Amino acid sequence: LYAWQGGQEGGNGVADVLTGKVCACGKLTDTIAQSIEDYPSTENFGDPFKNYYKEDIYVGYRYFETFAKERVMYPFGFGLSYTNFEYTVKPQVIGDKFTAEVTVKNVGDCTGKEVIQAYYEMCGGKLAHPSRELVAFGKTAELNPQESDTVKIEFKISDMASYDDDGTTGNESCFVLEKGEYNIYIGTDVRSAAKEYTYLQEETAIT
């Protein structure tokens, strides 16, 4: 059990989870690596005057999913529960939006909630891109055993644009949606999310 910054009710919350009064449904907002030395920021930590981001755009889970998957103990978005869930995905693009209706069923023995997460991957392009980028998420209602709920995951296609700071694409200081394929992954953490859709951007666009 990982309980961070619980505040004055943190102890009560932990007790409720440990005794089974509530079913845990929290998710990691960071990556837990094998060792502190696995984080690229470690060697630059402690300067009182400057912060050095050696990892550049690959901050947090973006670094591990792109360059060091084998160094991850618990991936971004991971979380345990006293129950189990199954889900089905119906993805589509309408106009300038991606939408997925995710039907989640509690197939375990305890009442609980689940968080559905959507990530994207830009295949190719002139700009550097992480292997995974969180773009949307949603949470079910509290589900009794064998009960289902549909979570609507939605985001604008332009949310997958990247910032071109030096004009690599010919569009300096702009958010650019490069032409090419964008794979969209849906799941319950960054590592287990499965590819559910491939979006084709036919022309580079400034967003």
Task: Please name every model-derived segment.
Residues 1-113, 121, 172-189, 193-207:
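Secreted, periplasmic, or luminal enzymes acting at the cell surface/secretory milieu
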Residues 113-117, 123-129:
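Surface-exposed turn/loop modules enriched in turn-prone residues
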Residues 126-170:
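Intrinsically disordered, low-complexity Pro/Gly/Ser/Thr-rich segments with frequent PxxP/GP/PP motifs
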